[in-house]
């Protein structure tokens, strides 16, 4: 069985909430009652928005992949960045696997750690093009702090053990001009460095 969010890249415009469940008839039958009890259909409007978005999926994803690689390369060469997590970088520990499996596109998500002397909240507030948000994978570039969002309720000691620290940021790269994104990041690093 495969459960996939249609809210992120498939939707791509931060304007729907949807998902898909795919699998054999046997597996789907085992959860069908839950779907009927809890509601498993999206509205006609959301279906229309999703259909609209899927038509541009390949164009959006290609641009996001291209931009993300450019941004990751910039960040990986900056003195105020401790680490960049992006499988498109040759120095990423899983680069060869990603290269084999991902057909040259490494995704639009770039995580990175700021130097310890930079306050991540101030860094995010200084950004002008990239916006802080809870939503990821839209056409616009957004940034989140996992300790304030996805991992907020996790024990801080456990978070630190797995590398989710106060200086870790998660950047969802959109389809803006890559130079504008790099300039935005560079300006914020300069202001806060």
Language model features with spans:
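Conserved PLP-enzyme active-site core in the AAT-like
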Residues: 1-80, 85
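Structural motif
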Residues: 1, 7, 20, 48, ...
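Positively charged, small/polar-rich N-terminal and surface patches that mediate targeting and assembly
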Residues: 22, 83, 131, 137-139, ...
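Glycine-rich beta-alpha junction loops
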Residues: 8, 56, 71, 88-92, ...
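Conserved small-domain helix->loop->beta segment predominantly found in fold-type I
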Residues: 69-128, 132-134, 155-160, 193
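PLP-dependent enzyme catalytic core of the Aspartate aminotransferase-like
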Residues: 118, 125, 141-193
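Short, flexible turn/loop "capping" segments at secondary-structure junctions
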Residues: 12, 42-44, 102-104, 161-166
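Short, well-ordered beta-strand elements within core beta-sheets of diverse protein domains
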Residues: 49-59, 107-115, 170-174
């Amino acid at each position: 069985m495969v459960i996939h969010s249609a809210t992120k890249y498939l939707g791509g415009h931060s304007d729907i909430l949807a998902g898909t469940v795919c699998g054999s008839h046997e597996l789907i039958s085992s959860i069908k009652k839950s779907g009927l009890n809890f509601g498993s259909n999206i509205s006609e409007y959301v279906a229309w928005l999703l259909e609209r978005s899927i038509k541009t999926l390949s164009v959006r994803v290609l641009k996001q992949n291209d931009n993300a690689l450019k941004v990751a390369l910039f960040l990986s060469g900056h003195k105020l960045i401790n680490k960049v997590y992006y499988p498109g970088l040759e120095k990423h520990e899983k680069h060869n696997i990603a290269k084999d499996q991902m057909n040259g596109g490494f995704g639009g998500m770039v995580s990175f750690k700021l130097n310890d002397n930079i306050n991540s909240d101030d860094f995010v507030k200084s950004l002008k093009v990239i916006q802080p948000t809870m939503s990821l994978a839209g056409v616009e570039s957004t940034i989140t702090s996992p300790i304030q969002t996805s991992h907020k309720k996790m024990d801080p000691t456990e978070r630190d053990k797995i590398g989710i620290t106060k200086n870790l940021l998660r950047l969802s790269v959109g389809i803006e001009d890559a130079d504008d994104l790099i300039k935005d990041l560079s300006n914020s690093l300069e202001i806060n460095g």
